[in-house]
Design a protein with these regions (language model features):
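Disordered, acidic Ser/Thr/Pro-rich linker "stalks" and the adjacent N-terminal cap
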Residues: 16, 24-78, 90-93, 152-159
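Trp- and acidic/polar-enriched beta-sheet ligand-binding modules for extracellular glycan
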Residues: 67-69, 91-153
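A short beta-strand element within beta-rich, extracytoplasmic domains
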Residues: 79-91, 135
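Glycan-recognition patch characteristic of GH18 chitinases/ENGases
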Residues: 156-283, 370-372
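Substrate-binding surface in catalytic domains of secreted glycosidases
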Residues: 171-183, 217-233, 301-421
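Conserved, mostly hydrophobic/aromatic
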Residues: 207, 297, 356, 396, ...
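Glycan-binding loop/region signatures in secreted carbohydrate-active enzymes
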Residues: 254, 391-455, 475, 481-494
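Active-site groove signature of glycoside hydrolases
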Residues: 280-308, 360-362, 465
């Protein structure tokens, strides 16, 4: 089992966020239940006048007669092409559902399955042609209640500027290649390029290099572990990375991590106030040294008003200087990784940010699971937009890792368990040890990654974000999560 640890907020904070998110959702469920403006085509389900799920009224509810295994069939009147279903639940009970189709109302073929419906759930699949559509609730905590089931043949307007950003680390394997004295420099370069896996970058538009570079309270910018890493390894890796990405037309962005740990916020404050000029000079100098196309910042998290006031001022000055001092001038991008709570960015700051990577996957749903469709996609993006960011600035974040219920700090790469879950399954039962009980680990499957991509695309958001690329399978693997993004985008842009 491949295991990796990511710095996340404390369990206490996660639980508070989870409860707050669910509470807000409860209070605004009718808003999301009527959120159907992003698919500009006929709702085919309205042709069936006999079912409360298809009457076009969010106020009415279809009640299943059994918790598990209940079915309802929609008759479209004739065989139709469609590729999307929107489901709207009253309450938060459904834990597993499937969608099947038929032309004779007797023999059904399953085309989709997943776990939760919640207040708003987009389900996407390859275009099918059928007359009858069956919703089966396989498992539910209580009797399922469905407000609406909408069926569409969604054909969105083609976009050429949809972003697919990915956070990625250099990877320890690079060090071994560079240290191998039996290899020539050319052989080392070839092996490093193999690790980069260029196939991803037919889909990815922005590669955000994270984990290597930090700043400190004195305004210095340096390698995270030692200068030897930069001198011996980093320059070689960046040269090879540039060669691969430049050929694909992919932007290369650097995340410069802030001081963290004990008194981390105090150290950040000192750097962005007393040593601001030095810090900005060093950030831009590092970006110019390796010809990064942009700078990305990930302060987790400014909390007080004083911290936000200082950060707002710092970001505005950083962007202004990037326009004149970065090697690519006006084309240089400034991006932020954002949590989905307690943001206090001013309109002036928001205007100078090119895009934000929304870490909605940190929010837990009512069952303590991270990154469900509604909480991490619909609700998270909506919150960021309410704060003043435009749709075009927002990248909706996807986790390529799983974690236990409750947002535990141990997190596991998708590529470690991909052979053991289906494209529709988000759960993996993991035995922690021989002495402890099995635990559910929640991942994002290919199906939900495709659905979230479709939601971002159809709703007009700027793009999506992957955290983290090294958790995925190789680009040529049919089970790759990046492939799920790519397949949808190829379908709508062909």
């Amino acid at each position: 089992m491949k295991k990796f640890t990511i710095t996340v907020i404390s369990l206490f904070m996660v639980l508070l966020i989870s409860l707050s998110a669910v509470g807000e959702a409860m209070g605004t469920s009718s808003k999301y239940a009527s959120n159907q403006d992003y698919i500009q085509s006929e709702n085919l389900a309205l042709r069936d006048k006999s079912n409360k799920m298809t009457d076009g009224k969010d106020s009415s509810v279809y009640r299943f007669k059994t918790r598990n295994g209940g079915e309802s069939v929609i008759d479209l009147g004739e065989s139709c092409d469609f590729n999307s279903v929107i489901l709207k639940e009253k309450g938060l009970n459904v834990q597993n559902f499937s969608i099947s189709v038929s032309d004779d109302n007797e023999s059904f073929t399953q085309i989709y399955a997943n776990d939760k419906i919640e207040f708003h759930r987009l389900c996407t699949f390859d275009t099918v042609k059928a007359r009858y559509v069956k919703l089966t609730v396989e498992e539910s905590d209580n009797l399922p209640k469905i407000r609406e089931m909408e069926i569409y043949n969604a054909v969105p307007e083609k976009k050429n500027d949809f972003r697919v950003s990915t956070y990625s680390t250099l990877g320890g394997s690079v060090f071994g290649i560079i240290d191998d004295t039996t290899l020539s420099d050319a052989e080392k370069d070839a092996k490093i390029k193999e690790l980069i896996d260029s196939g991803y970058y037919d889909t990815i538009t922005d590669y955000i290099q994270i984990g290597s570079v930090i700043w400190d309270e004195d305004g210095s910018v340096k390698m995270r572990y030692s200068d030897d890493i930069e001198n011996k390894y980093y320059a070689v890796m960046m040269r090879n990375l540039h060669e691969v990405l430049d050929e694909k037309g992919v932007n290369l962005v650097i995340t410069i991590l802030n001081p963290s740990g004990e008194n981390g916020n105090q150290r950040v404050m000192k750097s962005i106030t007393e040593n601001r000029d030095t810090l900005i000079t060093n950030m831009i100098a590092f970006a110019n040294k390796y010809e990064f196309d942009g700078i990305d910042l990930d302060w987790e998290f400014p909390l007080s008003q004083d911290e936000f006031d200082a950060y707002n001022s710092f970001l505005q000055e950083l962007k202004a200087r990037m326009k004149t001092e970065m090697w690519n001038k006006e084309d240089a991008t400034l991006s932020l990784a954002l949590a989905t709570w307690a943001l206090k960015y001013t309109p002036e700051t928001i205007e100078c940010i090119d895009y934000v990577n929304v870490m909605g996957y940190d929010i837990l749903d009512q069952d303590g699971q991270h990154s469900s469709f509604f909480s991490s996609c619909v609700q998270a993006a909506d919150y960021i937009e309410i704060q003043g960011f435009s749709k075009e600035q927002i990248n909706i974040g996807f986790p390529f890792y799983g974690t236990w219920e409750g947002g535990r700090m141990e997190q596991y790469a998708y590529n470690a368990i991909s052979e053991e879950i289906s494209p529709f399954n988000n759960f993996y039962t993991m035995k922690k040890s021989d002495t402890k009980e099995d635990r559910y680990t929640y991942f994002n499957s290919q199906a939900i990654i495709r659905d979230k991509t479709a939601y971002a695309y159809l709703k007009g958001y700027g793009g999506v974000m992957i955290f983290s690329q090294y958790c995925d399978l190789p680009s040529d693997d049919e089970r790759s999560l990046t492939k799920a993004i790519s397949d949808y985008l190829q379908e709508v842009t062909k």
